[in-house]
Amino acid sequence: METDAIDGYITCDNELSPEGEHANMAIDLTSSTPNGQHASPSHMTSTNSVKLEMQSDEECDRQPLSREDEIRGHDEGSSLEEPLIESSEVADNRKVQDLQGEGGIRLPNGKLKCDVCGMVCIGPNVLMVHKRSHTGERPFHCNQCGASFTQKGNLLRHIKLHSGEKPFKCPFCSYACRRRDALTGHLRTHSVGKPHKCNYCGRSYKQRSSLEEHKERCHNYLQNVSMEAAGQVMSHHVPPMEDCKEQEPIMDNNISLVPFERPAVIEKLTANMGKRKSSTPQKFVGEKLMRFSYPDIHFDMNLTYEKEAELMQSHMMDQAINNAITYLGAEALHPLMQHAPSTIAEVAPVISSAYSQVYHPNRIERPISRETSDSHENNMDGPISLIRPKSRPQEREASPSNSCLDSTDSESSHDDRQSYQGNPALNPKRKQSPAYMKEDVKALDATKAPKGSLKDIYKVFNGEGEQIRAFKCEHCRVLFLDHVMYTIHMGCHGYRDPLECNICGYRSQDRYEFSSHIVRGEHTFH
């Protein structure tokens, strides 16, 4: 009965199981123990039959599915992973080969280099777009107008022109644009502050482009640029101020030597006669009112007698005179006549007639007309000495001006005097400006007054009642509060004749005609 039952189970198992191998395995397992010994059929029949039945059912359900899943998973893995890896590697190799074939060179750092222009690109796509600039290829075309582009992004931005689409809109107003950077620039207009500030006039702007446009019109900025350029030129030519402070030797009780401010000026102008340089700027002692165009510097700076202040004042005056030269134009300046210097005299130095004065012991002349001055100039070709006797009382009343005015102005010679805080070392003839040096050929200066004899002729006060510095033109008798404007005005006077326009060469009869000519700007060039 047990054998039949077992056989019946076997037959049943054979009928139910889809494969015969599982049934045979079940039979073999029932006939053996884990120890390899044969168990009795009566003892192991029920337990082994139940276990084998359960295992056979589970294996019948799992094994076909697991094999199919394994096959499918293997097929899918091989079809997805391996082709992706192979395709990426092949694509990279193909791109590298194509780029190398087209002119791309792989660098050791992984970047690509164009063999046409040597441009280094970070990747193959960038190099591919760059190569189109050499080949002229534009694969992206607009269907509406036919415009072609090298990149797809440029085509998409171009299509927005036809559709009128403006996706970037301002949250504060109705402004809309097609590009993000344009919206970013527009949003700055709604900001409260103005970060872009002009350092020369103090104006502020919200955009840098507006500041750059302002600099093209900013007078202070343009003036500073010209002054810096002139200062760089003068730094190579102007000697230091210590060289200018030469002592004034006294020859004897009756003869004094007129000091020359900068001897290097003669050597400099000998090689360059067509240009006017600020070789001997005037120096002023006392409180000096300096006006700067920079907002970060106080407008009123009172400089004392320190040496640094004097050097700073001299440097600014050099720049101001060069600015006047730039304003007037170098082509309008007339060249000077330079005579060959002679040997040095025993008592005093001998210099060119273009920068010297002849002091006769018995008389002092003031040429009235240009003819007399020309005749006087012809007599000055020989050695010229700067030695002159000390002034007489009647000569002290003469005007220190070199204006070469007509005889009708002689009665106002007392008004021509200019006060320099009672310091005779600041006489205009000692600290000469370039205009005074050129005019010395046409006029003879009055002698220098003794210390303490000069008095303040005029005083200029501001709105607060404080006395301020003023500069007087000895030729036109005009006061200037700004030294730059004073220097520009002095540059309008001729070198030889103060009443001759230094711009166009027009010769005026008197100072009124000269002032009218300058104010009206009636310059005619022949």
UniProtKB/Swiss-Prot annotation:
Cross-link position per record: Glycyl lysine isopeptide (Lys-Gly) (interchain with G-Cter in SUMO2) = 95, 442, 448
Q: Which intervals carry biased composition (Basic and acidic residues)?
A: 61-77, 368-379
Q: Which residues carry this modification: N6-acetyllysine?
A: 288
Q: Where is the composition biased (Polar residues)?
A: 29-50
What's a single GO BP term from this record? positive regulation of transcription by RNA polymerase II
Q: Where is this region: Disordered?
A: 28-94, 368-435
In residue numbers, the zinc fingers (C2H2-type) are 112-134, 140-162, 168-190, 196-219, 471-493, 499-523
Q: Which InterPro entries match?
A: Ikaros_C2H2-ZF, Znf_C2H2_sf, Znf_C2H2_type
Q: Which UniProt keywords apply?
A: Acetylation, Activator, DNA-binding, Hearing, Isopeptide bond, Metal-binding, Nucleus, Phosphoprotein, Repeat, Transcription, Transcription regulation, Ubl conjugation, Zinc, Zinc-finger
Q: Where in the cell is it found?
A: Nucleus
Principal localization reads nucleus
- Annotated coiled-coil positions are none
Q: Which GO terms describe its molecular function?
A: DNA binding; identical protein binding; zinc ion binding
User: Which residues does this entry mark as bearing Phosphoserine?
Assistant: 56, 78-79
Give the Gene3D superfamilies listed for this entry.
Classic Zinc Finger
Q: Name one GO cellular component term.
A: nucleus
Q: Which PROSITE patterns match?
A: ZINC_FINGER_C2H2_1 (PS00028), ZINC_FINGER_C2H2_2 (PS50157)
- Report where it is expressed, by tissue: Expressed in outer hair cells (OHC) of the organ of Corti. Abundant in thymus, low expression in bone marrow and brain and no detectable expression in spleen, liver, kidney or muscle. Expressed in T-cells.
Give the superkingdom in one word.
Eukaryota
Enumerate the Pfam families for this protein. zf-C2H2
Q: How does it assemble?
A: Can form homodimers. Interacts with IKZF4 and IKZF5.
Which family does this protein fall into?
Belongs to the Ikaros C2H2-type zinc-finger protein family.
Q: What does this protein do?
A: Transcriptional regulator required for outer hair cells (OHC) maturation and, consequently, for hearing.
What is the official name of this protein in its record? Zinc finger protein Helios
